[in-house]
């Protein structure tokens, strides 16, 4: 194929239905030289097969970029330290992968001299915003092509028909129509019968987990160790980031931990439903939260809760590269200085419970809280504290009493 004088476009390529169709569509519609880029963030894929398929479908080049460790250290761990959870449930597995993927697409586009980046996110979803916000933040001169917003294919069924017509092999059929996103942190399931919120999801969709009902009848205990908010060891064994998360995924998944079925508010204004499996991440969040309870004071804990909510919203909305996000990271990092220690978790039938914790920087002091005889806390001191603490209440009560007495006297005079 002659590509010498063609403009180049970098396509975020997964080898799945949408991007396989988009690759061929870009050639037909724009006449671009298509460079496929598959970013490995820990998903279980045959990357050699993906590269082969991209080239066979018409790509002039196919990049396979493994950024799994960078994903964990630079994206997952900061979000973990922030305690960021979207709408109380979602651990942001898809959300924080998009800025890193977009960053790599920009790097490849700049290296190849491409004029555009294309992606397979739909016009109804959050990912289009996450991809494009990052691309605009890193290189505003690159054109962005989002076929789902412009082409005549209106459904995944249409894409299947297009693929069949063009001889593109695809991994789904009209009977298996779930849309999935996977990385080392989680896997999500959307679409199909999940679009009706009255339909209970079937546990046959699970990829990382067993259902809680089918998990072992005896609990498993696991001990996690943290250093300044970062997990460093499992059951006393030091792990590199990838091996650690792989180990925790197996542990949590075996007990049905980390499965959620939620209806969430998308950035674009609609609600969507998804089933998410985040076994290892659920363990890390539970342990980190327990350790913070041991090491952070009350005011910091309270204030950080608000920061966590805002942080989660920024990540969910794709605003990773913003001044506010950078500022929040500085605050979060300052809170993690003493979040060091161990937490023991109990895994049982889908539940993950922190049952023990210890830290050299613990603010929990048994000498002060004991119900037995103690020699460090003078309980008589509490009286003066309570008098001052409740002084506003006392003053208000005296004012009301005086006012009521005055009104009573006026009534007698009348």
Swiss-Prot record:
GO terms for biological process: argininosuccinate metabolic process; L-arginine biosynthetic process; urea cycle. L-citrulline binds at residues 90, 95, 126, 130, 179, 188, 264, 276. Its main location: cytoplasm. PROSITE patterns: ARGININOSUCCIN_SYN_1, ARGININOSUCCIN_SYN_2. GO terms for molecular function: argininosuccinate synthase activity; ATP binding. Pathway: Amino-acid biosynthesis; L-arginine biosynthesis; L-arginine from L-ornithine and carbamoyl phosphate: step 2/3. Pfam families: Arginosuc_syn_C, Arginosuc_synth. It comes from the Bacteria. InterPro entries: Arginosuc_syn_C, Arginosuc_syn_N, Arginosuc_synth, Arginosuc_synth_CS, Arginosuc_synth_type_1_subfam, AS_cat/multimer_dom_body, Rossmann-like_a/b/a_fold. Disulfide bonds: none annotated. The keyword Coiled coil does not apply. Keywords: Amino-acid biosynthesis, Arginine biosynthesis, ATP-binding, Cytoplasm, Ligase, Nucleotide-binding. It catalyses: L-citrulline + L-aspartate + ATP = 2-(N(omega)-L-arginino)succinate + AMP + diphosphate + H(+). It is found in: Cytoplasm. Gene3D superfamilies: Argininosuccinate synthetase, chain A, domain 2, HUPs. Its EC number is 6.3.4.5. L-aspartate binds at residues 122, 126-127. The keyword Nucleotide-binding applies. GO terms for cellular component: cytoplasm. ATP binds at residues 12-20, 120. Homotetramer. Belongs to the argininosuccinate synthase family. Type 1 subfamily. This is Argininosuccinate synthase. It comes from Alkaliphilus metalliredigens (strain QYMF).
